[in-house]
Amino acid sequence: MKPIALKLGGYQEPASIHNRAASRFGELLTRKFGDRISFELIGNVLKIGRPSGDLAAMVENGEIDFCYLSTVRFAKWVPELKLLELPFVVKDRKALSAAFTGGFGDLIRRRMRESTPYRLLGLWDNGFRHFTNKVRPIRTPADCQGLRIRSQMSELHAEVFRAFGFEPIPVDVKQFIEEIASGRFDAQENPLTNTYNFGVHNYHRYITLSGHLFGAAAFICREERYQSWPQDVRAAVDSSASEATTYQHHLAMVEDAEILSKLDPSKNEVIHLTDAERAAFVKASQPVLDRHRKELDPKLFAYLEA
């Protein structure tokens, strides 16, 4: 019998926590089914000329079966995901992990089924996002004035950065990586794992641990494709995705300290904000938070405090 071919696409390097979790997912399925399935991880579609933004469409049209992708890409269909785009709302990472695997994850799973062709298999921890730049240490919003910053494909993020004083330029990660060395961007913001694994630290001396936003990635497949698999394969996909998600959350929890230990102090200056300095960024972005908070069900914020 011909094996069930399963392909998972991502946009990062092999050492990234996302691709390590994706590999774990494939290992679990292969261990259970052996030759009954074939599993292929296309860990970085950027290397085959595709932007990360193509991943969801690749799942929808059947080029691949699974992918992980920033939840920013799904917020227009699932407005509840905007909760994760708001500045400084995530304070307790463990509480958020519990929400991802609990009530909030269940809510997003339902909303994605209702509004998209996708099935949510897990919400992955993309980490606290921090500023890096090549110009000067950033300690206050005044230090951000006039700096061109690459942002994700999110107008809400752009609003936050404008509130800080940046000039945001939204581009896909593929274009960002290709241009980071060109000097187009003075600054960028990413979780430390991306800053390091994408090599940004080689071009940006200054790393400010701002934690201004928290990122999440949706691990998805196409609902129609999922329903085409035999019941035992569907069950194994669910259980393997759950285990891979738990593993991914664990990796994310310890990754920041590991990345900081790898940075060379002679090449990178890590700026730890004082409480007062952080408060200045919170104050600057408060109007953005207040404006968008009105658009969301107040009950959503309870997930961040559970």
Where are the predicted features?
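N-terminal secretory/targeting leader peptides
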Residues: M1-A95, R113-E114, Y118-A306
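Hinge/lid segment of periplasmic solute-binding proteins
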Residues: A99-S115
